């Protein structure tokens, strides 16, 4: 990649701008054409560290040149004598193509993956009954999540769902098929203090597959395939025994850090592994609550879309995803 000539070309393009807005639009077009494709190449690169430094340097030069041309543009405006000349030209706005928000794009990617496996894609209501949010998912009466300090209750029989498993539980109960495949997605709500890694509202994807003969081996194959589909690499996965009321056995799934080549970094907290989702085989009490009393088994997992976005695009603050900041949104398409 010839960075020097690209930057020269950028200067020529930006100097055609008539105002600051036009300048930013021209810069965004350049970034979309020349910078963003490099991130796709980075996924396939054998030397990610060297290429990552090159991309970062290219990005910094783009910002520096943009600021430089903007200053020239502002200085030029200051020199105009309005008494002698007035620009009466009406410029037509430069229209950029719209694009999906990063969270919607990731949800679309996951939905596309599951559609190929004949899964039914559902969303469901965000206002649900505690019966489906807790009771049908084997969450006992003394579980902390049932407290008003942890969940948003509208009244004694209505609440904001705390996970999309609630929706899959509802569809599971009403499904008469022998082979049940459901993927649900949408907003979930928990009483967390908003900070760099937590939000009271976030997006989640949940899946349930019920069929005769399903085992942990099937579950691991499906998750490994999804991770490869999302990140475009043959990332190693690690399954750690855990506990969730609605699955048995339960696992936490980690992926090998794709940023540091097993050297340890801030993303993986020096562990070389990144926790990405919870999963397991559906608990027999969950199946019974859905009137499934035969020999079929089920498997499920839930994953936060916000977390996938932060890991995939190296976003260090979850609040950026909900800020409606044009400069931030324009960088990720």
From Swiss-Prot:
Residues that, per the record, bind Mg(2+): 248
A Pfam family matched in the record: tRNA-synt_2d
Residue ranges that the Swiss-Prot or TrEMBL entry lists as coiled coil: none
Gene Ontology MF annotations: ATP binding; magnesium ion binding; phenylalanine-tRNA ligase activity; tRNA binding
Cofactors, names only: Mg(2+)
Entry GO terms, CC: cytoplasm
Principal cellular location given in the protein's record: cytoplasm
Textual note on the cofactor: Binds 2 magnesium ions per tetramer.
Keyword Aminoacyl-tRNA synthetase: yes
Location within or outside the cell: Cytoplasm
Keyword Protein biosynthesis: yes
Gene Ontology biological-process entries: phenylalanyl-tRNA aminoacylation
Enzyme Commission number(s): 6.1.1.20
Catalysed reactions, semicolon-separated: tRNA(Phe) + L-phenylalanine + ATP = L-phenylalanyl-tRNA(Phe) + AMP + diphosphate + H(+)
UniProt KW keywords: Aminoacyl-tRNA synthetase, ATP-binding, Cytoplasm, Ligase, Magnesium, Metal-binding, Nucleotide-binding, Protein biosynthesis
InterPro entries per the UniProt record, alphabetical: aa-tRNA-synth_II (IPR006195), aa-tRNA-synth_II/BPL/LPL (IPR045864), Phe-tRNA-synth_IIc_asu (IPR004529), Phe_tRNA_ligase_alpha1_bac (IPR022911), Phenylalanyl-tRNA_Synthase (IPR002319)
Quaternary organization: Tetramer of two alpha and two beta subunits.
Family label: Belongs to the class-II aminoacyl-tRNA synthetase family. Phe-tRNA synthetase alpha subunit type 1 subfamily.
Protein name: Phenylalanine--tRNA ligase alpha subunit
Species this protein is from: Ureaplasma parvum serovar 3 (strain ATCC 700970)
């Amino acid at each position: 990649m010839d960075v020097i000539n690209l930057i020269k070309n950028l200067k020529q393009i930006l100097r055609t701008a008539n105002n600051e807005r036009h300048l930013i639009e021209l810069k965004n077009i350049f970034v979309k054409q020349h910078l963003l494709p490099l991130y796709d190449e980075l996924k396939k690169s054998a030397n990610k560290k060297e290429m990552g430094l090159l991309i970062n340097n290219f990005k910094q030069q783009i910002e520096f040149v943009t600021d430089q041309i903007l200053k020239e543009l502002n200085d030029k405006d200051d020199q105009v004598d309005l008494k002698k000349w007035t620009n009466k030209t009406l410029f037509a706005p430069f229209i950029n193509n719209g694009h999906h928000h990063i969270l919607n794009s990731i949800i679309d990617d996951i939905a596309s993956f599951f559609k190929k496996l004949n899964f039914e894609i559902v969303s469901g209501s965000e206002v649900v009954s505690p019966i489906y949010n807790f009771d049908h998912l084997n969450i006992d009466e003394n579980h902390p999540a049932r407290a008003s300090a942890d969940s948003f209750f509208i009244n004694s029989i209505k609440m904001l769902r705390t996970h999309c498993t609630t929706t899959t539980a509802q569809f599971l109960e009403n499904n008469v098929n022998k082979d049940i495949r459901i993927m649900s997605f949408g907003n979930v709500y928990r009483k967390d203090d908003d900070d760099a890694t937590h939000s009271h509202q976030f997006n989640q994807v949940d899946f349930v597959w019920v069929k005769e003969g399903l085992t942990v081996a099937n579950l691991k194959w499906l998750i490994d395939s999804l991770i490869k589909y999302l990140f475009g690499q043959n990332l190693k996965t690690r399954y750690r025994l855990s506990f969730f009321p609605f699955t048995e056995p339960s696992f936490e799934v980690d992926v090998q850090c794709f940023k540091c080549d097993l050297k340890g970094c801030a993303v993986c907290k020096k562990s070389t592994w990144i926790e990405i989702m919870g999963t397991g085989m559906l608990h027999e009490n969950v199946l019974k609550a859905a009137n499934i009393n035969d020999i079929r088994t089920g498997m499920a997992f839930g994953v936060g879309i916000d977390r996938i976005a932060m890991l995939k695009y190296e976003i260090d603050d979850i609040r950026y995803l909900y800020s409606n900041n044009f400069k931030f949104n324009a960088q990720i398409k």
